[in-house]
């Protein structure tokens, strides 16, 4: 996916405000996942997950390729058994020989040490869930954990996690410590409750084990299906890491967001809120739809915040009684004609009241000023007035005259 190195507003804009509107991202360490880097000031990375059975080699290869071709930079694959880990090795090799080397994350959950050790040989990153990596048999009669019991289980976790940490460290590979609000370990629930604090403490326990073994190629996630819980958990995690001198990158996502318009709104509400605070280095929009549907949402969020520019930015008014042409129809025509011109800002405004001012940051403007005619702008400068039925054609001619047109 093409990304302009530094998204900015048009250089044609006069009297630029001295107020800095750039999002200041939290400083994090770079974590290499194959040929992609998460954190360290690199562009926010877009991820997704295939929904094929990993034992279906050809289906999984095709699914990974479909995602990667539309801009998914890292792809996650579920690995619930040793057989799936072996299959993923074959998937990886088949991708290399038939397509290209795509960074893969293995998703490992219940009692996952043996699975994780096997799959770590073949892919770039392993995701583990602290609440499920070491099985704690629930005790319905329990009312609390003593400190000794808490620490005893912590030591078992260390013994189970250490081999994976060491093999990832020695191979230069990465780990995501992926906490889920819905699967906190029982002792965390008893000690901290079903809270963002419990999520943070769960992550910190695993981070400290990794650090004690000199492994810091770590990414952290704090996912929840409720946006307020998710936002609070990530903010608390960022604060605790800052207080402790930790600089691990954060993977953002609202888990189980659903589908359709609301699923997209819910994901955006959580992810964009944190990104606007400067929190977040990689994102996944989780939809109950084909994974390919997630990728455009990710890039739209990043573009809207000015964090990555991978498409044309269109500015258009909502239309009102002053509008002098069919705004929805014209915007569609302009978009279809120019959507391949990555990097441009184009404004389509229905009347003169807000047109020139609202589109001041755009490279080109298409404004209704006189019935039957369109005024075309370059930045704030009106270039010419043309008949309405020639508006889109003349806009293209203006872009071509400026040497900014490329054939689709």
Curated annotation (Swiss-Prot):
HAMAP family found in the cross-reference section: IspG
Similarity comment: Belongs to the IspG family.
Catalytic activity: (2E)-4-hydroxy-3-methylbut-2-enyl diphosphate + 2 oxidized [2Fe-2S]-[ferredoxin] + H2O = 2-C-methyl-D-erythritol 2,4-cyclic diphosphate + 2 reduced [2Fe-2S]-[ferredoxin] + H(+)
Skewed-composition ranges (Polar residues): 1-21
Organism: Trichormus variabilis (strain ATCC 29413 / PCC 7937) (Anabaena variabilis)
One MF term in the entry's GO annotations: 4-hydroxy-3-methylbut-2-en-1-yl diphosphate synthase activity (ferredoxin)
Protein name: 4-hydroxy-3-methylbut-2-en-1-yl diphosphate synthase (ferredoxin)
Cofactor binding note: Binds 1 [4Fe-4S] cluster.
Pfam families recorded: GcpE (PF04551)
NCBIfam families to which the protein is assigned, alphabetical: ispG_gcpE (TIGR00612), PRK00366.1 (NF001540)
SUPFAM superfamilies according to UniProt: Dihydropteroate synthetase-like, Nitrite and sulphite reductase 4Fe-4S domain-like
Pathway in which the depicted protein is active: Isoprenoid biosynthesis; isopentenyl diphosphate biosynthesis via DXP pathway; isopentenyl diphosphate from 1-deoxy-D-xylulose 5-phosphate: step 5/6
An annotated GO BP: isopentenyl diphosphate biosynthetic process, methylerythritol 4-phosphate pathway
EC number from the UniProt entry: 1.17.7.1
UniProt entry keywords in alphabetical sequence: 4Fe-4S, Iron, Iron-sulfur, Isoprene biosynthesis, Metal-binding, Oxidoreductase
Spans annotated as Disordered: 1-26
Binding site for [4Fe-4S] cluster: 317, 320, 351, 358
Function summary: Converts 2C-methyl-D-erythritol 2,4-cyclodiphosphate (ME-2,4cPP) into 1-hydroxy-2-methyl-2-(E)-butenyl 4-diphosphate.
Cofactor(s) this protein cannot do without: [4Fe-4S] cluster
Metal-binding as UniProt keyword: yes
């Amino acid at each position: 996916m093409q990304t302009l190195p530094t998204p900015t507003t048009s250089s044609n804009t006069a009297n630029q405000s001295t107020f800095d509107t750039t999002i200041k991202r939290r400083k994090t360490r770079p974590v290499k996942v194959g040929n992609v880097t998460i954190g360290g000031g690199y562009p926010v990375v877009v991820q997704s997950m295939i929904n094929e059975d990993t034992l279906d080699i050809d289906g999984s290869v095709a699914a990974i390729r479909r995602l990667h071709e539309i801009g998914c930079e890292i792809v996650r694959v579920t690995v619930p058994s040793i057989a799936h880990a072996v299959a993923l090795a074959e998937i990886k090799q088949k991708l290399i020989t038939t397509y290209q080397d795509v960074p893969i994350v293995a998703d490992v959950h219940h009692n996952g040490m043996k699975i994780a050790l096997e799959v770590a040989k073949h892919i770039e990153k392993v995701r583990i869930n602290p609440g499920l990596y070491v099985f704690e048999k629930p005790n319905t009669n329990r009312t609390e954990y003593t400190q000794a019991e808490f620490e005893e289980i912590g030591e078992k976790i260390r013994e189970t996690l250490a081999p994976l940490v060491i093999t990832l460290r020695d191979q230069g590979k990465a780990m995501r410590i992926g906490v889920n609000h819905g699967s906190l370990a029982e002792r965390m629930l008893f000690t901290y409750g079903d809270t963002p604090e419990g999520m943070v403490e769960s992550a910190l326990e695993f981070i400290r084990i990794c650090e004690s073994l000199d492994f810091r190629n770590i990414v952290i996630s704090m996912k929840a299906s409720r946006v307020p819980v998710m936002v609070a958990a990530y903010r608390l995690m960022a604060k605790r890491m800052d207080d402790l001198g930790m600089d691990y990158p954060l993977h953002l996502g609202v888990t189980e967001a659903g589908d359709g318009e609301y699923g997209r709104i819910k994901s955006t509400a959580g992810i964009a809120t944190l990104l606007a605070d400067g929190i977040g280095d990689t994102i996944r929009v989780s939809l109950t739809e084909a994974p390919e549907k997630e990728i455009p949402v990710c890039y739209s969020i990043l573009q809207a915040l000015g964090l990555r520019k991978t498409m044309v930015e269109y500015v258009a008014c909502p239309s009102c009684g002053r509008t002098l042409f069919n705004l929805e129809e014209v915007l569609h025509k302009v978009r279809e004609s120019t959507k391949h011109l990555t990097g441009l800002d184009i404004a389509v405004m229905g009347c003169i009241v807000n047109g020139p001012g609202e589109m001041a940051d755009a490279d080109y403007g298409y404004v209704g000023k006189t019935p039957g005619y369109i005024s075309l702008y370059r930045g704030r400068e009106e270039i010419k007035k043309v008949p309405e039925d020639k508006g889109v054609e003349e806009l293209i001619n203006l872009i071509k005259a400026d040497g900014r047109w490329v054939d689709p």
